[in-house]
């Protein structure tokens, strides 16, 4: 018998919201009887943007901004139909991007 697996990737700019969402998903999956692997922290993506402070001159004066994208991975092994139904009804914050692969 082949094992079924649901792979969930979460992305967010705020790691606290991301961890809360991951805990909700893990808790929901465990409550419905599936075994869960994760949340596994994936490498944080860091984008750095450099801009000039002045409009026309003073090229040596620059300012840097960074944007960090935190990621988590959750595997749900042998999900039941109740697990899938509970995950579809789960309400997560708007700042979290969810990618689900079956």
Curated annotation (Swiss-Prot):
A Pfam family annotated for this UniProt entry: Ribosomal_S10
Keyword DNA damage: no
Gene Ontology MF term list: structural constituent of ribosome; tRNA binding
GO biological process terms, semicolon-separated: translation
Keyword Zinc-finger: no
Transmembrane segments: none
Keywords: Ribonucleoprotein, Ribosomal protein
Domain of life, per lineage: Bacteria
HAMAP family hit by this protein: Ribosomal_uS10
Assembly and binders: Part of the 30S ribosomal subunit.
Family: Belongs to the universal ribosomal protein uS10 family.
Role: Involved in the binding of tRNA to the ribosomes.
Record-given protein name: Small ribosomal subunit protein uS10
Provenance organism: Shouchella clausii (strain KSM-K16) (Alkalihalobacillus clausii)
Organism lineage: Bacteria, Bacillati, Bacillota, Bacilli, Bacillales
